[in-house]
């Protein structure tokens, strides 16, 4: 009920019910970023007096199975047996980072550590540059914006847009407890 009220007032907030063996019943929520997530969390705690358990953000991957069908994977438990998987695909975003020229090297290093592939570099004047990288969304959603702000002393900006899905070198890892496959914590 509290989530529905928030969704009515904030069309950018999405949620759907989900059940986990490890955590029980809950909701998978979609936000515009970490700040948006923190605001929603505070509103739920303050207005609805709800204690929340928050898990790390994740992204939707695609799998092409042996029959050539493309399947969206929202959680690790949905990954089919390895024998049924032809190819894993990860979401890629194009990141435009505007930085003071003094911090170009630090930002490039950070983007490369996040598996980014540089697309362009353009000087916007004597003091600023825009660096464009294609980076896996999983490397962006958690803290890339904060890291860019940190390594540019608050002067860097980041915006990104979805490019599509690209092949990824991934595999399924099962966690077994007492011989039974369980959800990852």
Feature annotation, model-predicted:
Residues 1-185:
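Structural and coupling elements of P-loop NTPases
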């Amino acid at each position: 009920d509290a989530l529905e009220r928030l969704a009515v007032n904030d069309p950018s907030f999405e949620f759907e019910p989900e059940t986990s063996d490890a955590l029980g019943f809950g909701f998978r929520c979609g936000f515009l970023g970490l700040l948006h997530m923190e605001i929603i969390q505070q509103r739920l705690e303050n207005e609805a007096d709800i204690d929340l358990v928050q898990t790390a953000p994740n992204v939707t991957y695609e799998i092409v199975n042996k029959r050539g069908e493309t399947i969206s994977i929202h959680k690790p438990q949905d990954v089919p047996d390895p024998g049924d998987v032809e190819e894993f695909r990860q979401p890629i975003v194009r990141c435009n980072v505007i930085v003071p020229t003094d911090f170009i090297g630090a930002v490039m290093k950070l983007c490369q550590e996040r598996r980014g592939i540089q697309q362009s570099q353009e000087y916007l004047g004597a003091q600023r540059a825009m660096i464009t990288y294609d980076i896996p969304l999983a490397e962006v959603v958690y803290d890339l914006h904060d890291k860019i702000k940190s390594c540019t002393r608050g002067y860097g900006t980041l915006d990104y847009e979805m490019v599509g899905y690209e092949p990824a070198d991934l595999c399924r890892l099962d966690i077994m407890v007492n011989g039974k496959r369980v959800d990852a914590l």
